[in-house]
């Protein structure tokens, strides 16, 4: 209750301050200096692209080869684990398993942190920049990223901590510390764990909450016809209360919500995409031909060649499915199992759902829409359609509106659901990282929730 009151007072204070100066501007001014420093270190470029993309994709390819394509060999097994087919086999003689949630709940929680507005706006941006060929490389990156998820989530379960009350604490903070200690690099492990925890907390405040809340507020204001910062603050207040009620109950309540919301929102979006694709059945073959052709022989304006399109697709996929980021292993660590690798198998389904399925669906809708020549591929990420500039989610919305009357209501619902689910998961990631740094007591718990 104290947490909820604090959240309300904070947001009311922000809404009052926003009358003097825009809230977005205040936040930008406060965090810009620190953000610039971190961006320069983390996203330094090599050949015009962030080095972290080379690292993530290279690691994914390495794990795929070393483990002999687990993304393909164990795909069916992963589905069976999620279905609970092997639950009896996972029981020990004492008939007990550490953990707090089921395989499906852990998967739903992790997927809710990755399937977000990037699947709507990010894909549109990638296609606008690199053309249809970017879709091919997104799919490739998603497929090999499955192997990375397999590795990091197996480690998350293997090195997790379980307290006397059965509460689980896991993620990169723990497997970096324990794993590197086993190999004689104890100090390096501790430093790496602290750096990850700090970055994860920052991510939970920024991209995990603030950015998602902001995007949801924008689409709701547009739909309702409001154009004030105060309206955005009130929408943020409602979202904060909703998310706060959920996360205050811990991983069990989070999992019970995500196991219902994630399948619903994913199915809703996929069905809408399938309706549009099915309504244009004759274009499907041409769309896939264009995706493959443009992947190796791009014609988008301003695209330098195959490597440029490849990097655009890889960049979008890597940041969409978060393979290699380590965040998903925090959710998967809470699973009820005595076999770490079983949850690694479950985790490899995430990039497939996020990138290979949902991102590809969005891409096909946009590509089919543009067979009419609505806009030119390439440029700075924005496209002109009938003399109006569209960017990100606006491109996707325009494509949907062409085939589904009143689609703004559907897309607004999708964006809000995606945003809320991402906020829920990333709040959990943040609080787990916070507890690693400042202890697992009630005070540390309340301080984070107050700040979030």
Question: What is each residue range found by the language model?
Answer:
Residues 2-113, 117, 128-134, 145:
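N-terminal alpha-helical transmembrane segments of multi-pass membrane transport
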Residues 55, 63-80, 192, 196, ...:
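Membrane-interface loop-to-helix entry segments
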Residues 63-64, 112, 141-166, 177-214, ...:
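Helix-loop-helix module between adjacent transmembrane segments
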Residues 71-101, 125-127, 131, 135, ...:
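Flexible loop linkers connecting adjacent transmembrane helices
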Residues 90-127, 155-179, 195-201, 305-352:
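Alpha-helical membrane segments and immediately flanking helix-loop junctions
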Residues 141-152, 235-251, 262-282, 315-316, ...:
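Selective recognition of specific alpha-helical transmembrane segments in multi-pass small-molecule
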Residues 152-160, 164-165, 272-290, 298, ...:
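Extracellular/periplasmic helix-exit of transmembrane alpha-helices
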């Amino acid at each position: 209750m104290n947490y909820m009151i604090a959240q309300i007072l904070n947001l009311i204070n922000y809404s009052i301050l926003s009358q003097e100066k825009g809230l977005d501007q205040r936040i930008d001014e406060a965090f810009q200096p620190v953000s610039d420093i971190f961006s320069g270190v983390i996203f330094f470029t090599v050949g015009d692209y962030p080095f972290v993309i080379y690292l993530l994709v290279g690691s994914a390819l390495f794990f795929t080869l070393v483990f002999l394509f687990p993304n393909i060999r164990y795909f069916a097994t992963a589905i069976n684990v999620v279905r609970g087919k092997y639950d009896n086999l996972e029981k020990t003689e004492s008939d007990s398993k550490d953990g707090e949630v089921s395989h499906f709940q852990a998967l739903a929680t992790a997927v809710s942190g990755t399937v977000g507005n990037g699947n709507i706006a990010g894909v549109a941006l990638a296609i606008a920049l690199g053309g249809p060929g970017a879709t091919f490389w997104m799919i490739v990156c998603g497929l090999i990223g499955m192997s990375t998820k397999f590795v990091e989530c197996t480690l998350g379960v293997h090195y997790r901590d379980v307290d006397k009350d059965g509460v689980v604490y896991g993620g990169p903070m723990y497997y970096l510390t324990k794993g590197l200690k086993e190999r004689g690099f104890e100090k390096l492990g501790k430093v790496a764990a602290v750096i990850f925890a700090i970055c994860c907390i920052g991510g939970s405040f920024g991209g995990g909450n603030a950015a998602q809340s902001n995007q949801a507020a924008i689409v709701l204001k547009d739909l309702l016809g409001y154009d004030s910062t105060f309206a955005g603050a009130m929408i943020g207040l409602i979202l904060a209360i909703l998310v706060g009620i959920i996360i205050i109950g811990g991983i069990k309540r989070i999992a019970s919500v995500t196991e219902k919301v994630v399948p619903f929102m994913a199915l809703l979006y996929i069905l809408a995409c399938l309706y549009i694709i099915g309504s244009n059945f004759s274009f499907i073959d041409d769309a896939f031909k264009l995706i493959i052709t443009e992947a190796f022989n791009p014609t988008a304006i301003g695209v330098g060649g195959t490597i440029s399109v490849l990097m655009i697709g890889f960049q979008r996929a890597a940041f969409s499915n978060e393979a290699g980021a380590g965040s998903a292993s925090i959710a998967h660590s809470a699973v009820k199992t005595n076999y770490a690798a079983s949850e690694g198998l479950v985790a490899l389904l995430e990039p497939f759902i996020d990138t290979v399925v949902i991102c590809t669906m969005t891409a096909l809708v946009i590509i089919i829409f543009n067979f009419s020549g609505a806009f030119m591929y390439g440029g700075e990420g924005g496209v002109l359609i009938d003399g109006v500039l569209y960017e990100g989610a606006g491109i996707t919305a325009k494509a949907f509106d062409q085939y589904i009357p009143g689609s703004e209501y559907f897309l607004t619902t999708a964006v809000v659901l995606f945003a809320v689910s991402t906020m829920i998961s990333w709040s959990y990631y943040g609080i787990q990282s916070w507890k690693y740094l400042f202890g697992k007591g009630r005070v540390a718990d309340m301080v984070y929730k107050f700040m979030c």
